[in-house]
């Protein structure tokens, strides 16, 4: 019985050591990537979204930040952001305006 507990505790220690080595390796890998200035697409999107939150709504043009996104014709025909009125809930809504 004593030998079995020693083997189990040795295996537990070995597993804990392997997990710690993996954790350290991952941490240094992330640190090195940050030092190189690399950002994954999701990290880049999060940082851009964080910047968007600090800007006023009417000053943001998503095309400047996301040139790959193609705008639909209905979005391009909308009025500019400067003339946007938050109180007009049905502006640009064809169904509410009775166009069909």
Swiss-Prot record:
Keyword Phosphoprotein among record annotations: no
Subcellular localization(s) per the UniProt record: Host nucleus
Protein origin, superkingdom: Viruses
One Gene Ontology cellular component: host cell nucleus
GO biological process: symbiont-mediated suppression of host innate immune response
Nuclear localization signal (motif): residue ranges: 22-27
Entry keyword annotation includes Signal: no
InterPro entries linked to this entry: Cucumo_2B
Gene3D superfamilies, alphabetized: 1.20.5.3800
Keywords: Host nucleus, Host-virus interaction, Inhibition of host innate immune response by virus, Suppressor of RNA silencing, Viral immunoevasion
Listed transmembrane segments: none
Function summary: Multifunctional protein that plays two independent roles: viral suppressor of host RNAi (VSR) and viral inducer of host attractiveness to insect vectors (VIA). Acts as a suppressor of RNA-mediated gene silencing, also known as post-transcriptional gene silencing (PTGS), a mechanism of plant viral defense that limits the accumulation of viral RNAs. May directly interfere with mobile silencing signaling. Also inhibits signal transduction by the phytohormone jasmonate, making the infected plant more attractive to aphids, which are the second host to play a role as a dissemination vector.
Description of how the protein assembles with itself and partners: Homotetramer. Interacts with host AGO1; this interaction blocks AGO1 cleavage activity to attenuate RNA silencing and thus counter host defense. Interacts with host JAZ.
Family affiliation: Belongs to the cucumovirus/ilarvirus protein 2b family.
The name this protein goes by in its record: Suppressor of silencing 2b
Protein's organism: Cucumber mosaic virus (strain Q)
């Amino acid at each position: 019985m004593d030998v079995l507990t020693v083997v189990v505790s040795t295996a537990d220690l070995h597993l804990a050591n392997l997990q710690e080595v993996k954790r350290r390796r991952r941490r240094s890998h992330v640190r090195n990537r940050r030092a190189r200035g690399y950002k994954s697409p999701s990290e880049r999107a999060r940082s851009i979204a964080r910047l968007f939150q600090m800007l006023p709504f009417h000053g943001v043009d998503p095309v400047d930040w996301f040139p790959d996104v193609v705008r639909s014709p209905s979005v391009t025909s909308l009025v500019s952001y400067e003339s946007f009125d938050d109180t007009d809930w049905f502006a640009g809504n064809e169904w509410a305006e009775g166009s069909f």
